[in-house]
Amino acid sequence: MTPSFLLHLRLADPSDVTSLYDIRQAAIRQLSLTHLSECEATAWAERGGIPRVERAIAKDELWVATFGLQLVGWLHRAANSIEGLYVSPPAARQGVGTALVRLAESHIAQTGHPLVVLESSLNAVGFYLRLGYAPAGTQCSSAAVPMSKHLEAAKHVGRSPLR
């Protein structure tokens, strides 16, 4: 997929639910197979369905990325945690995930949190390492790696960037 439109980021709304669920399913089933068996990917894809997405939308915790009118990715953030990041396979490696993570980091920094935490799927560890995240804590699951990143901007919340 070569985007013919600029990437646009916005809060998700209830009309997005089905598309977001479909993106999650496709991303897990197609992009995680480099590190998971098909059975493991299917089990993961079937957890946390539509009700979880609806709750995140209701709390304004879910952002979407679009190329034109097409939803191509989404990120769920709660407090200082990235709870999930999914990009449509045709839009993978085109900056969608990076843009969503940067947006989440900005919002987290604005709330004064100095640290972003997440659990990365095995296939996404390299992506998060490139964005400055580091393994953190004890890995309790064979399919998830705890990671974190310190945010310098959080130290300057409320200050003018020119000071």
Sequence positions of predicted segments:
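C-terminal "cap" of GNAT-fold acetyltransferases
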Residues: F5, G112-V125, L131-R163
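A short beta-loop-alpha structural element at the N-terminal edge
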Residues: H8-D22
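Conserved GNAT-fold acetyl-CoA-binding loop/helix
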Residues: Q25-P51
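Conserved beta-hairpin
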Residues: K59-G73
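A conserved beta-strand-loop-helix scaffold within acyl/acetyltransferase catalytic domains
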Residues: G73-N80
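A short, internal acetyl-CoA/4′-phosphopantetheine-binding micro-motif in the GNAT/acyltransferase core
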Residues: I82-R93
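Conserved acetyl-CoA pyrophosphate-binding loop and the N-cap/start of the following alpha-helix
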Residues: A91, G95-L103
